[in-house]
Amino acid sequence: MGEYIMEKNTIILGIETSCDETAVAVVKNGTEIIANVVASQIESHKRFGGVVPEIASRHHVEEITVVLEEALKEANITFDDIDAIAVTEGPGLVGALLIGVNAAKAVAFAHDIPLVGVHHIAGHIYANRLVKEVQFPLLSLVVSGGHTELVYMKEHGSFEVIGETRDDAAGEAYDKVARTLSMPYPGGPHIDRLAHEGKPTIDLPRAWLEPDSYDFSFSGLKSAVINTVHNAKQRGIEIAPEDLAASFQESVIDVLVTKASRAADAYNVKQVLLAGGVAANKGLRARLEAEFAQKENVELIIPPLSLCTDNAAMIAAAGTIAYEQGKRATLALNANPGLDIEA
């Protein structure tokens, strides 16, 4: 069959509203960002210490049309130039997802444009293709607020979850520990910053689980941090928050990097891709770089910070592959908060 040559440029409009970002992007050929607009709601959720689904949905309703128009203007295109619309159908908050799905269906119907549903985590993985062409087989370490998993891919559009969290996602643990240390939401960046000022002097558990397991568990670690703080308060002992942050972060990163490294060897992959919101963590990025610098036959790809947190360019990138593989959604497409990436 020879090399696959694209006859014309494929222009995909991506829409992402799975949590607290209203995002619309335009991507060319699955690799080049033409427009990438994100309206964040962090300020609205800050005082509640987490995302409030009802508030998130209302914001999406207010923002979606504005963000959509802004993306088209930034890309300097009209709906006639778009080959397909890719939208996050799940997983996420059902009310939030529905706003994006309904907006995508309305545009697809009004302008007679093909529609493609995208898995949110597939989007995070394909954010890496906006940095560099991916090579198979590959392994993706997905670390976000709701997900922590190792995903093996032997080809485009094929996802095998070889390891996942059995309880809390790494991002959840970060937010809960941040709350224990009275830090504002979202906690991840605050812990990361504080960790760099401290030393990992506090002995905290690492959940390795069974010897051959690639699964993760962070609830024990989270409880250990909360108990350490609680016990110190009861005994009137002062614990340096930066040392606690450094100890917690080292425990999380140790397990993530060790398991990713072991899986990369076992599955003989060509590339390891970092994906998800926690991929913005400086400590994690540095440790992965150090680990994979020692492996000559494995290339590590880490997306820029702007592509780690939720955005629609990654949804358009994943949607390009689905579109080229002939996948189409009908106007019956619905939000699916529990969508399985392997389905």
UniProtKB/Swiss-Prot annotation:
Its EC number is 2.3.1.234. Binds 1 Fe(2+) ion per subunit. It catalyses: L-threonylcarbamoyladenylate + adenosine(37) in tRNA = N(6)-L-threonylcarbamoyladenosine(37) in tRNA + AMP + H(+). Its cofactor is Fe(2+). Keywords: Acyltransferase, Cytoplasm, Iron, Metal-binding, Transferase, tRNA processing. One of its GO terms (biological process) is tRNA threonylcarbamoyladenosine modification. The keyword Transferase applies. Its main location: cytoplasm. Substrate binds at V142, V143, S144, G145, G146, D175, G188, D192, N281. The keyword Transferase applies. GO terms for cellular component: cytoplasm. Required for the formation of a threonylcarbamoyl group on adenosine at position 37 (t(6)A37) in tRNAs that read codons beginning with adenine. Is involved in the transfer of the threonylcarbamoyl moiety of threonylcarbamoyl-AMP (TC-AMP) to the N6 group of A37, together with TsaE and TsaB. TsaD likely plays a direct catalytic role in this reaction. HAMAP family: TsaD (MF_01445). Belongs to the KAE1 / TsaD family. This is tRNA N6-adenosine threonylcarbamoyltransferase. It comes from Bacillus thuringiensis (strain Al Hakam).
